[in-house]
Amino acid sequence: MNATKFVVLLVISVLCAIVTARHVEEVSKETKLGTSLPKSTTKGIGAQLSAAGITSSSSDVYSSATGFNNPKGPDANAYENGYTSTSGQVIAKGRKARVSSASASTAKGDAKAAVTRKAAAARANGKVASASRVKGSSEKKKGKGKKGKGKKD
């Protein structure tokens, strides 16, 4: 490294040290805004209001029935399996955000098999149902008190 590069790097580091060493002064919200507002008003300034809800449900059913006549004699198999899954996620920001979510699912299966030496019969069926609901808001409730009374905007 030659002397010119060394001096340039030295000057840059001194400037960086001066910039980072400056005292940061705390400024109130009223000063930043250039107004004098009540404390209750400034608490809500810059607040993010949002409400989001996600919910899902799924159902799955598997039913199987077999009946057969083999050389060793008649045989019957019946199998059923039901699966349900529900999940939900709620995200709310802000003092007035409200979210509710609900999900439900059901799965029902039925399998039957019957065999005689001369005949075989099998039946399988399944039913599934899923439902999801999400409701949310980030607005203030309007109209406290009796209807028709209060301030008009």
Swiss-Prot record:
Keywords of the record: Signal
Signal peptide positions on this chain: 1-21
Highest taxon listed in the record's lineage: Eukaryota
Biased composition (Low complexity): 122-132
Region annotation (Disordered) ranges: 63-82, 122-153
Ranges of compositional bias, category Basic residues: 141-153
GO biological process terms, semicolon-separated: mucilage biosynthetic process; seed coat development
Family according to the record: Belongs to the UPF0540 family.
Name by which UniProt lists this protein: UPF0540 protein At1g62220
